[in-house]
């Protein structure tokens, strides 16, 4: 466990701007240089442990995500029609009901038809719902155990949701597959499916639909989905025509590195010293 912890302690966060503003950014640093959350954080810590980049802490509403179109792929708050995006509170839920994030070095290729769903990918890294009891923070790299997957249909595209638990959670040793989640946390799976079904309704969109009638896939399928999306990332990372700045040539751009290093830091701490819940904002008029 100590060696696993050491694997992620080599990464630090540099936060510029403030949450709830368009200038908010979280950069990933290694050896005092900015790196890419998407390309440079490894997918795994060992054969059974995956690295998850936390984008949205549990119970919060700001829609933050890794930006695939920005140099070094920082996390930023998403914009739509020039306005910052938030997820509405859909009764009885408050914000996101798990720590939500992405698996680095994975890509749901929009040019490839998924063998299970028969639909193309959504063009993003794989999403992760981390179901542990602790509340993460934006940019935190959590080491997680994969448990299963839920297939969401997003505007005619495949949008997998990987369910996982922080390996440091007390329940992690008891949860080894999606069936264990059903037995130990019986309300979590139906609530997760319900949340994804209704969360866009306050924005005037219809109820979301699922592949496989909303049934969860077991760990073995989830691991296979991850392996496929990791392969898509490997194959496509040099095809710059697919995603602007997808190829990580920016790591050698000295001027760009100096520009990012010169940005005013709001927070710059080792993850082990970071406050457990630094972002709690009451968002009005949702």
Swiss-Prot record:
Its main location: cytoplasm. GO terms for biological process: phosphate-containing compound metabolic process. It is an enzyme of class 3 (hydrolase). SUPFAM superfamilies: Inorganic pyrophosphatase. One of its GO terms (molecular function) is magnesium ion binding. It comes from the Eukaryota. It is found in: Cytoplasm. Its cofactor is Mg(2+). Mg(2+) 2 binds at residue 127. Keywords: Cytoplasm, Hydrolase, Magnesium, Metal-binding. It catalyses: diphosphate + H2O = 2 phosphate + H(+). InterPro entries: Pyrophosphatase, Pyrophosphatase_sf. Belongs to the PPase family. PANTHER family: INORGANIC PYROPHOSPHATASE. This is Putative inorganic pyrophosphatase C3A12.02.
